Every structure is written in structure tokens, then in C-alpha cells.
């Protein structure tokens, strides 16, 4: 009997790949640079950007011999120039410089600038028709239809760099669109997975920041505790893969080993597994369509012992329900959802509201915005940024009454 043949083609990208990393000094950027560092002969760094960490940015520029670096804070240009004195690295500062970095010729761009500030640079990379590894949620949550349309028009390849969407991307390759019945995004359940609703309502900041599996920044860790992050991922999946809300399910999986599953018409389910390490999905993006040597630990299922799953609780975690509501409302509602959540999380961190009030502020903001009748398709990055600011202002005006109800 002949064995089933495995693909044994030459690397699709056997030469040196030119790469740029937007947000190089953040956690995603750090993981990306770690992978590039492991195989320096395969990559040439074109451009790097950072927010305000000039020392870290200059260090990376020197290590990887970057051609251009940009710091987002325009007041740091002099500091950046001084740090790069004696090198051939060109530098700039401010939004225009970051956009310039994104638009420079590169085979592959990591778009990892957080917040709305990452939208225009990501679009600049997309407009070049290059391959963009996307780690900025605002591009999809705040401008999904517009962003994906621009990518299609430019012939850009969008690769999802977060673990769940990268898992779906890999699993979706096992079938055709018309054969798909649903995708399943997994969630750890966060630190409050087994807590009663009354206890979740009163949870402290310290408790919300104790994620059981992932090491992440403060904002995303709180989003995980409220399951707002999973709501955002549902929205992202809808735009990224052109899925309806009814084609996206969420499954709580405390071990965070299975990151995404895809069910096909024949009832086959294809899943992607891996340790909870962001270097795994980033490595997939960096090597795509090839596979590169990873830096994360190998998966030892025998050591893990068991994988468990449970349905999400939309009552204890209303933020997840609100994401589906926003998707079905459309016309900018997902932008409002995201902006209101950011205002709510900032208020919780500042101890202005209880943990349970995060979802209430998001829901009240969405309802108020819908009643005002301002829904309209977003036609540009400026439209998305303007709506984001409008929603933040609306959430801020509703915040005092939400805080008063909780006191």
C-alpha cells in the first residue's frame, strides 16, 4: 500500500523576506522580533514603529539594521535621532511618519499598533497590496467592511495574528466556503468562569487581572474577565471571514489549548491546537504559506491530561450577548460597542464603576446611539475614527448615572 502523500514542495518564499513591524515595542511586536531574531538570514527589516519607547525602538533598529523607524509621539523625535546617531537609520515621528513606515516597500507587515491609531497605518500597508499580519482589532471592529473591501481592492493578503482567528484561518483551509456550517471560537472563561453573578458584579481590579492562562496587558485581561474580548473576536471573525452572526459560536474551554474549530457540512470538525503562546500564531503568519521553526514550547497533551468544554453564560457575561446584538444592528454599532467598552474599562480601572457596570455602560451607550438614529455605513477611516470619538463622548456622558446606580 502506498502512503498518503504529504506536500513536499519547496518553500514558497525561499529568498530573503522584507518585513516591517508596526508596534515593534509592544507585546505582539516583541514576539514578532523574537521570531525574526531566531532566523535573521531569512528576513530584512525595512521599518519599525513604536509609541513612546524610544530606547527600545532604537535598540531594535540597531540590532536588525532597520532602514526606517518612526515613533508615534512627535515630541520624541529629537530623542530618537540622538539614540540613532552614527547609524544609517532614517527616522521620523508623529502619525505621518508611522503611516510612512507602513507604506514602505515590504513583503510582509505586522500591524500591531493598538487602538484607533493603528487603523490608518494598517490601511497604508494594505493599499500597497502586501501581506499584512493583523493584530489590531480596531481595523475590523471599527471599520470591518471598509477595511476588508480596501484589502480586496488592493490585492492584499490579510493574515489574522491573534490565536483564535489564526486557528480558524488554518482550519478553514480544510474545506470550501459553501461547505462551511459554523466556526467556533474558544474562550478560557477568564478568572470569573465559575463565579456567581453577584460576585462578578462586585469583583475587584486585582481579581479581574488574574487571568488563569494568558499573560496579557491590563485592558485585554479585564476584557477577558468580562468576556468582552470574546465579543470583540466574534465581531472580528464576522468581518474577517464574511460570516453571519449565526455562523459563529463561542465555546468555553478553560485549558486554552484548542483555539478555534470549524464545522463542515459532512459534520467533520477541524480544530487547531497549541500552547497558549502568541508566538505560535505569529510564526504561522510570518512564514505563511510556509511553516517556520517555532519558539514556543511543544504541546504535551499527556501532561495536560484533559480538555474540557462548556457553553458560555450570556446572563453572567452580557458583554458577549451585546457583541452579537451590535453585529446584527450593523452600520457602525460594533464601533460603538468597542468605544463604550474602552470607556467603561478605563472607569473600572479608575474605580469609578463596579466591574458589573462595564456591560451596563456598553448596553446603555448602544441603546442611546440607536435611539438617536445615527446609524450609517462607514465609508472611510475618518468616518470610523469620528464615530469612535462620538461613541466615547456618549459613553462618558452616561457614565455618571451608571456609577450612581451602582453606588
From Swiss-Prot:
Enzyme class: oxidoreductase
Reaction catalysis annotation: 2-C-methyl-D-erythritol 4-phosphate + NADP(+) = 1-deoxy-D-xylulose 5-phosphate + NADPH + H(+)
Pfam families with a match to the protein in the record: DXP_redisom_C (PF08436), DXP_reductoisom (PF02670), DXPR_C (PF13288)
Transmembrane feature ranges: none
GO BP terms in the entry: isopentenyl diphosphate biosynthetic process, methylerythritol 4-phosphate pathway involved in terpenoid biosynthetic process
Molecular function in Gene Ontology: 1-deoxy-D-xylulose-5-phosphate reductoisomerase activity; manganese ion binding; NADPH binding
Binding-site residues, Mn(2+): 162, 164, 233
Cofactor: Mg(2+); Mn(2+)
InterPro entries in the cross-refs: DXP_reductoisomerase, DXP_reductoisomerase_C, DXP_reductoisomerase_N, DXPR_C, DXPR_C_sf, NAD(P)-bd_dom_sf
Binding locations of NADPH: 25-28, 53, 136, 138, 217
EC number: 1.1.1.267
Sequence positions that bind 1-deoxy-D-xylulose 5-phosphate: 137, 163-164, 188, 211, 224, 229-230, 233
Alphabetized UniProt keyword annotations: Isoprene biosynthesis, Manganese, Metal-binding, NADP, Oxidoreductase
Pathway info: Isoprenoid biosynthesis; isopentenyl diphosphate biosynthesis via DXP pathway; isopentenyl diphosphate from 1-deoxy-D-xylulose 5-phosphate: step 1/6
Physiological role: Catalyzes the NADPH-dependent rearrangement and reduction of 1-deoxy-D-xylulose-5-phosphate (DXP) to 2-C-methyl-D-erythritol 4-phosphate (MEP).
Homology family: Belongs to the DXR family.
NCBIfam families for the chain: Dxr
Protein name: 1-deoxy-D-xylulose 5-phosphate reductoisomerase
Organism of provenance: Rhodopseudomonas palustris (strain TIE-1)
Amino acid at each position: 500500500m502506498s502512503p498518503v502523500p504529504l506536500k513536499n514542495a519547496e518553500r514558497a518564499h525561499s529568498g530573503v523576506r522584507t518585513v516591517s513591524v508596526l508596534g515593534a515595542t509592544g507585546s505582539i511586536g516583541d514576539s514578532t522580533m523574537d521570531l525574526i531574531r531566531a532566523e535573521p538570514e531569512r528576513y530584512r527589516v525595512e521599518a519599525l514603529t513604536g509609541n513612546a519607547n524610544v530606547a527600545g525602538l532604537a535598540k531594535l533598529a540597531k540590532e536588525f539594521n532597520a532602514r526606517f523607524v518612526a515613533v508615534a509621539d512627535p515630541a520624541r523625535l529629537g530623542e530618537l535621532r540622538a539614540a540613532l546617531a552614527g547609524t544609517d537609520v532614517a527616522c521620523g515621528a508623529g502619525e505621518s511618519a508611522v503611516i510612512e513606515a507602513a507604506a514602505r516597500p515590504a513583503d510582509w507587515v505586522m500591524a500591531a499598533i493598538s487602538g484607533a491609531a493603528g487603523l490608518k497605518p494598517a490601511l497604508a500597508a494594505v493599499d500597497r497590496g502586501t501581506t499584512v499580519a493583523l493584530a489590531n482589532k480596531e481595523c475590523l471592529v471599527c471599520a470591518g467592511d471598509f477595511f476588508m473591501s480596501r484589502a480586496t481592492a488592493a490585492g492584499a493578503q490579510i493574515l489574522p495574528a491573534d490565536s483564535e482567528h489564526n486557528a480558524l484561518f488554518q482550519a478553514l483551509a480544510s474545506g470550501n466556503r459553501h461547505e462551511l456550517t459554523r466556526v467556533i471560537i474558544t474562550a478560557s472563561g477568564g478568572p470569573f468562569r465559575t463565579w456567581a453573578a453577584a460576585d462578578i458584579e462586585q469583583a475587584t481590579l486585582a481579581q479581574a487581572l488574574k487571568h488563569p492562562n494568558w499573560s496579557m496587558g491590563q485592558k485585554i485581561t479585564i476584557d477577558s474577565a468580562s468576556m468582552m474580548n470574546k465579543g470583540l473576536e466574534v465581531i472580528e471573525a464576522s468581518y474577517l471571514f464574511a460570516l453571519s452572526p449565526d455562523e459563529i459560536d463561542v465555546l468555553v474551554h478553560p485549558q486554552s489549548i484548542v483555539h478555534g474549530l470549524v464545522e463542515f457540512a459532512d459534520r467533520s470538525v477541524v480544530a487547531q491546537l497549541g500552547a497558549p503562546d502568541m508566538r505560535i500564531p505569529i510564526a504561522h503568519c510570518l512564514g505563511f504559506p510556509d511553516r517556520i521553526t517555532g519558539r514556543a514550547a511543544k504541546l504535551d497533551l499527556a501532561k495536560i491530561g484533559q480538555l474540557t468544554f462548556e457553553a458560555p453564560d450570556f446572563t453572567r457575561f452580557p458583554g458577549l450577548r451585546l457583541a452579537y446584538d451590535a453585529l446584527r444592528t450593523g452600520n457602525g454599532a460594533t464601533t460603538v460597542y468597542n468605544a463604550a467598552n474602552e470607556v467603561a474599562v478605563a472607569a473600572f480601572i479608575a474605580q469609578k464603576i463596579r466591574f458589573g457596570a462595564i456591560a451596563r455602560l456598553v448596553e446603555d451607550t448602544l441603546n442611546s446611539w440607536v435611539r438617536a438614529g445615527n446609524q450609517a455605513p462607514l465609508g472611510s477611516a475618518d468616518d470610523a475614527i469620528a464615530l469612535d470619538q462620538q461613541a466615547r463622548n456618549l459613553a462618558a456622558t452616561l457614565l455618571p448615572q451608571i456609577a450612581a446606580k451602582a453606588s
